[in-house]
Amino acid sequence: MNLKQLSLPELEAALAPAQPSATAVRKVFAGVFAHARPTVDAVALAPQVPRRVADLLRAQAEMPSLKIVERRQAEDGFVKYLFESPLGGRIEAVRIPIFEEKYVVCVSSQVGCALACDFCMTGKLGFQRNLQTWEILDQVMQVRAEADRRVGGVVFMGMGEPLLNYKETIRAAQILSHPAGFSISGTAITFSTAGHVPAIRRYTKEGHPFRLAFSVTSAIPEKRAKVLPIEKTHPLPELIQAIREYSEARRERAMIAYVAIQGFNLEREDAEALKAAFEGIPIKVDLIDVTDPTGKYLPPTAEELSAFRDHLQILKAPIARRYSGGKEIGAACGTLAASQYGGTVLPTPAASPRQA
């Protein structure tokens, strides 16, 4: 049994032959995630873990880990981790500083990505495989182990489309938000999706406490299809309806991610298309400057973005510009591609100053 892979109910079932109490199961679960005990033996030796449970753990349990290949720090404090998995493939996670208070960890959910968004470097890798739950969680665990402040949020905005790895990412989020797990608020966990409509509807129906961010980028279908091929499979009207259902079920504004591209999607007609598409749906819009190392797509000029924000006032919705940091180390939105360049290579810490 892989202790990093199991939710609390799954762990209870796996330990059933040892007839543990609910307290003992919770102690094992907390030992793995909340207290980050590094080995099976360390978990087995935790207080209130009975001998029969400890014996079962030593006989059957394992706790695999990702290998940190490299850490790179940008001038703005963003740190990109390059991991190698024993199951094959390399993935990246980003430690994002939030003022002086906490970190948010941006995690990957797949090795590569099948969606091939035209401005995204991950999509150029193609799809290799889905990550298992433990591989997702271990990204957070290893970043947390080296952090000098608490990890207060997780965003599934790294490599891959999280809703195409639904079971594993949802289980990971459930463990992240569990009080005996990572104890991260469900509202501080966000899944970014390019618009996989069946998974969005499933998510809405199941009523999870986590948040979705919808990558729209253009409300003009012909424009959207040029940069987001998923538009051809799940057309904008279907996506808009799924977003409407999500917003109504949660009684909150839907977060619309809009990648701002110079000379492409920042005209008055683009704002008017957004207004028409989301009529009657409460939304908030996050503007994100495109980061494309190939140079095919350029970020907006200051004048262009200012004018577009003025155009967006017709939405009567909150508009924010999301900072996409770590550009020189390939840590910005859309640039994760298991690359090694730029910034400062950080040594392996001699100690673990983590604040759990």
Regions found by a protein language model. Give the residues of each.
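P-loop NTP-binding catalytic core
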Residues: 87-97, 101
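Canonical Radical SAM [4Fe-4S] cluster-binding loop centered on the CxxxCxxC motif
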Residues: 97-135
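Conserved alpha-helical substructure of the radical SAM core
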Residues: 123-153
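Generic beta-strand structural signal
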Residues: 79, 91, 103-107, 115, ...
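Auxiliary Fe-S-binding modules of radical SAM enzymes
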Residues: 1-91, 244-253, 259-356
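Conserved AdoMet/S-adenosylmethionine-binding subsite of the radical SAM
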Residues: 144-153, 158-322
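Short linear Ser/Thr-Pro motifs
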Residues: 74, 108-109, 192, 215
